[in-house]
Amino acid sequence: MDSVRRTYTIMRGRHIDKRVPSKEFLSALDKAETAVRLPTGTGKDCGNPSWKRSLPHVLVASLTSLLFGYHLGVVNETLESISIDLGFSGNTIAEGLVVSTCLGGAFIGSLFSGLVADGVGRRRAFQLSALPMIVGASVSASTESLMGMLLGRFLVGIGMGIGPSVTALYVTEVSPAYVRGTYGSSTQIATCIGLLGSLFAGIPAKDNLGWWRICFWISTVPAAMLAVFMELCVESPQWLFKRGRAAEAEAVFEKLLGGSYVKAAMAELVKSDRGDDADSAKLSELLFGRSFRVVFIGSTLFALQQLSGINAVFYFSSTVFKKAGVPSASANICVGVCNLLGSTVAVVLMDKLGRKVLLIGSFAGMAVSLGLQAIAYTSLPSPFGTLFLSVGGMLLFVLSFATGAGPVPSLLLSEICPGRLRATALAVCLAVHWVINFFVGLLFLRMLEQLGSVLLNAIFGFFCVVAVIFVQKNVVETKGKSLQEIEISLLSSTQ
């Protein structure tokens, strides 16, 4: 371990690395790493660290995803009673604002998520994301006006904007390589559980006008749990290493991986950090530097994810099912169950089939299901056929989304981003996600009225086909590779 520490000192000392001859430096580093490479197998027999050490930390971080899913769906069943109680019933613009204001707040939160995560660390960033979600949900639950509701939703959105970025960072950085995909997918399961929970919680709102307030109060409990339990979790070793706290990073690796894997993990960090400036990442490096390709892939994936229309399904599925003559409560629960089922499949397959295969299959399945829904709203099928194709197509759409297009983009981006730029790159890409999400939420009902279901589904389906082509041509496979191996491979290919 001493050789790794010496190499670390050379690299991280202020400007010392600029005076070290390149060949001498690389030779010293290679000698330090010769006997401490991380295993790349897929099980215990291959010498991998136990996944049980990191699991509790991932579960606590997943509370952010649970809150994300809950707030994503909390207005689905309750929007009608909220509009009646607060006096804007029938105003589609106001109803759209209740949804999209949250997304506007999420955009603001995502813009600053990288600065927060790099500035105060991942653990404190989680706690800072919980605070506006607690305050915002409390404001929404107790308000008597539309403006109060919008303020509360905006504050919740800020927390939602910070949370997913930090979750993707943290889970990626504390997970062993051989289960990183599984853990990344498990956060999507937490999102599904939160979404399904919001749908169940909202069922009484149909008969109890004031029940929607209880639905908002419920969300303060997991937010408070996140803030408290994060005190018991470890900090990201990558963040500690970047801050010059190598000894603490070693201690964290020992907790996460076990003592016999600390040397290998530290050597990998040193290798990925060699030659990099220790200063904080700059936005210009992402937009004009050698990491632009990473940001381009991530931003495009998030954009296509939203342009597929998935969140329009979650926000307004009650309205869509009502038009099809299906009881919204039971249909929405079916949506939540399909989402959970697809996410479970993703957990099983993520580290077996890989990210790229799941993305292609997911977007292809979504395109097919949108085609079925478009046919349902033509004059071709019988009334029963219309019901079967519209509802069945929507459920297939959600199932397909949850197997790849849902969990993969944030996981993939957190894997392919260079360590020093990871938080900033995620913030930029998630900002793109929230901007498009905002406009989809704001304009979906109006577009449904003016364009009709057939044309709208055709537009969403077109973007799914574009996504299949884009993934095939641009996305690299990261299954089973350490973060440092991925980073070195990508950066060397762009030089």
Curated annotation (Swiss-Prot):
It comes from the Eukaryota. Signal peptide: none annotated. Keywords: Chloroplast, Membrane, Plastid, Sugar transport, Transmembrane, Transmembrane helix, Transport. The chain crosses the membrane at residues 55-75, 97-117, 131-151, 154-174, 183-203, 214-234, 294-314, 330-350, 357-377, 384-404, 425-445, 451-471. GO terms for cellular component: chloroplast membrane; endosome; Golgi apparatus; trans-Golgi network. Belongs to the major facilitator superfamily. Sugar transporter (TC 2.A.1.1) family. May be involved in the efflux of glucose towards the cytosol. This is Probable plastidic glucose transporter 3. It comes from Arabidopsis thaliana (Mouse-ear cress).
